[in-house]
Amino acid sequence: MKTLIRKFSRTAITVVLVILAFIAIFNAWVYYTESPWTRDARFSADVVAIAPDVSGLITQVNVHDNQLVKKGQVLFTIDQPRYQKALEEAQADVAYYQVLAQEKRQEAGRRNRLGVQAMSREEIDQANNVLQTVLHQLAKAQATRDLAKLDLERTVIRAPADGWVTNLNVYTGEFITRGSTAVALVKQNSFYVLAYMEETKLEGVRPGYRAEITPLGSNKVLKGTVDSVAAGVTNASSTRDDKGMATIDSNLEWVRLAQRVPVRIRLDNQQENIWPAGTTATVVVTGKQDRDESQDSFFRKMAHRLREFG
């Protein structure tokens, strides 16, 4: 009898432990799969594509790739002598038309004072028309001069903001055309994280909620705040035909892949971030407040570790 009771007790204890373990693992798995988190996240930053507004030979490159530069710092210079000559020519034209306009103004004023008693109305009108033509030419010459001055100023390409020069692909002696991208500038203190959350997890994501960011290959956890959630994504299942009619792709009702929606996360401390734009991270949205690790259960901690390494 005692042996039977002992066997039953062992069996009961084993069953209870298995059930408890199953419940714990199930809860950890639910927390792992349904709470708002994703491994599909990227560090991003504001990037300025720098292109010259004038064409010409590059005469000097003042920076090197991946250099940190300050706003207004010279990046490279384009053939200035040519644009200096163009400015001098435009200034000479302005000076010529200024003198000519003064002469025609005096002539028109003299004829207007003498009036029709000394000459015909046609001669007076002709003098006034010549003056207006010269004034128009003077205005055009001044505009050309201002444009030449602007072109000369823009032969010196400067950094529009503090940041890092990246993908520098210009060299002294090369010819560069107007509008062609020469270098990218990653703005300093503009880094953020784009987390691509599955639509099934968006219920736990709101602007202002706190987030944890773990870069791939690192145990360092950065803190951030949900800044915004994208208002829409492309509908890959619907297109338009050549007549404007909607074309809907067929799908299997029992197999539905969750869409991913971009969630922008603002980093608390820009100075702590050493990860370049485009690198991967894991993001966990913890809710209105930061997660208190001391209050986490063993299985919840295990779920967090699964997120990092899974």
Swiss-Prot record:
SUPFAM superfamilies, per the entry: HlyD-like secretion proteins
Protein's cellular compartments: Cell inner membrane
Entry keyword annotation includes Ribosomal protein: no
Gene Ontology cellular-component terms listed: plasma membrane
GO molecular function, one term: transmembrane transporter activity
Membrane topology: Single-pass membrane protein
Keywords of the record: Cell inner membrane, Cell membrane, Membrane, Transmembrane, Transmembrane helix, Transport
Transmembrane segments: 12-32
Signal sequence, renumbered to the chain: none
Induction comment: Positively coregulated with aaeB and aaeX by AaeR.
HAMAP family per record: AaeA (MF_01544)
Biological role stated in the UniProt entry: Forms an efflux pump with AaeB.
Family, per entry: Belongs to the membrane fusion protein (MFP) (TC 8.A.1) family.
Protein name, as recorded: p-hydroxybenzoic acid efflux pump subunit AaeA
Organism for this UniProt entry: Escherichia coli O1:K1 / APEC
